[in-house]
Amino acid sequence: MPLNKESKQAVVAEVSAQVAKAQTVVLAEYRGITVGDLTKLRAKAREQQVYLRVLKNTLARRAVEGTPFAPLAEQMTGPLIYGISEDAIAAAKVVNDFSKSNDKLIIKAGSYEGKVMDKAGVQALANIPSREELLSKLLFVMQAPVSGFARALAALAEKKQGEAA
């Protein structure tokens, strides 16, 4: 069903608002994917706060015009699904993880910090641990010396009590 001018403007405004807040945009070709699989992808995207949208490439080009993602316009050909996220790696991770289990979803390109990435670049970005994972690893590394010191003190106190008895 063709969109009228007002609805096209509304779509461009909605996508432009998402792009303005985004750190990452990922494009993937979805030719041949079933509705059920696409629904699963959308559910995973929602869980990760990734804005996922199938839209006409001309409207997508208008939405990214004048943003750091404008160079992606050259890659916008064919049936594409757009993953847009404020988190630097969430969109890449959602699309990459889904493409591993569904060979019909083909990562085409992406953009992060104004740089256009090919499929390998998007996959590399997706393999970076999330902020939460990195913070938990940092916390573990910071706690290790303290907990080791505490165990040594406890062992020393136990030894002293054993000698006193």
From Swiss-Prot:
CC per GO annotation: large ribosomal subunit
Keyword annotations: Ribonucleoprotein, Ribosomal protein, RNA-binding, rRNA-binding
Top-level taxonomic group: Bacteria
Single GO biological process annotation from the record: translation
GO molecular function: large ribosomal subunit rRNA binding; structural constituent of ribosome
SUPFAM superfamilies hit by this protein: Ribosomal protein L10-like (SSF160369)
Gene3D superfamilies (UniProt xref): 3.30.70.1730, 6.10.250.290
Keyword Transport: no
Self-association and partners: Part of the ribosomal stalk of the 50S ribosomal subunit. The N-terminus interacts with L11 and the large rRNA to form the base of the stalk. The C-terminus forms an elongated spine to which L12 dimers bind in a sequential fashion forming a multimeric L10(L12)X complex.
UniProt similarity note: Belongs to the universal ribosomal protein uL10 family.
NCBIfam families in alphabetical order: PRK00099.1-1
Function: Forms part of the ribosomal stalk, playing a central role in the interaction of the ribosome with GTP-bound translation factors.
Protein's name according to its UniProt entry: Large ribosomal subunit protein uL10
UniProt source species: Paraburkholderia phymatum (strain DSM 17167 / CIP 108236 / LMG 21445 / STM815) (Burkholderia phymatum)
